[in-house]
Amino acid sequence: MKKVLFYVLPFAFFGCSATVDPQISMKPPAYVEELAPKQSNNVESAPGSLFGKGDNPLFSDKKAMNVNDLVTVIIQESTTQSTQANKATSRTNTSNLDGGTLTGSSGVVASALDKVNAYSNIGFQTNSSNNYTGTGSQSRNESFNTTISTRVIKILSNGNYFIEGSRELLINGEKQIIQLSGVIRPYDIGQDNTIDSKYIADAKILYKTEGEVDRSTRKPWGSKVIEAIWPF
């Protein structure tokens, strides 16, 4: 029984304290689902007009205007992080107990006790000191640049667009996945039907890889078990 517990307990601790890889939900924000879609105004044009509502009118804005229209997002994200922490603690304790601690009130007793103290004048002193100094620093610079075509999923009642798009590439056995969603204003879309990612509200950008490189960078399960139960 003891041998069984010896082998099972580490895995039990690992199951309680195992870490999960960070995840991101591409689900639309709550307000996007709650807001009613904008009602489209179907205005009929006069027959023979140059501004008709055909599939390719002569005079029209090339920017996305309706549901299922495409918008190209230029992703230019960069993050810079620098943190530093210092901690120092110190504690010192001193205790003294002198010899000759016996005393008396009357003269005879006091005289006798003085003689005893002279022979038993034993005292002690203790000193303890604890010091701790810790320093930590971290710096990180990351950048991610790419473009992705998204689709207008919903036009909100205030005229803003909820967009969503994804792209998957398979190169030499490595699969790259890019997903993006968020809310944009139609006024921020350029004349070439592109928009910078900095103008996307509630932006969610996911980039991950699947393949040999991704598997080689993951920690083996044995290392995770040791880290989970290692107390120091």
Swiss-Prot record:
Its main location: membrane. It is found in: Cell outer membrane; Bacterial flagellum basal body. One of its GO terms (molecular function) is cytoskeletal motor activity. Keywords: Bacterial flagellum, Cell outer membrane, Lipoprotein, Membrane, Palmitate, Signal. GO terms for cellular component: bacterial-type flagellum basal body, distal rod, L ring; cell outer membrane. A lipid is attached at residue 16 (N-palmitoyl cysteine). It is a lipid-anchor. The keyword Lipoprotein applies. The basal body constitutes a major portion of the flagellar organelle and consists of four rings (L,P,S, and M) mounted on a central rod. Assembles around the rod to form the L-ring and probably protects the motor/basal body from shearing forces during rotation. Belongs to the FlgH family. This is Flagellar L-ring protein. It comes from Campylobacter jejuni subsp. doylei (strain ATCC BAA-1458 / RM4099 / 269.97). The lineage of its organism: Bacteria, Pseudomonadati, Campylobacterota, Epsilonproteobacteria, Campylobacterales.
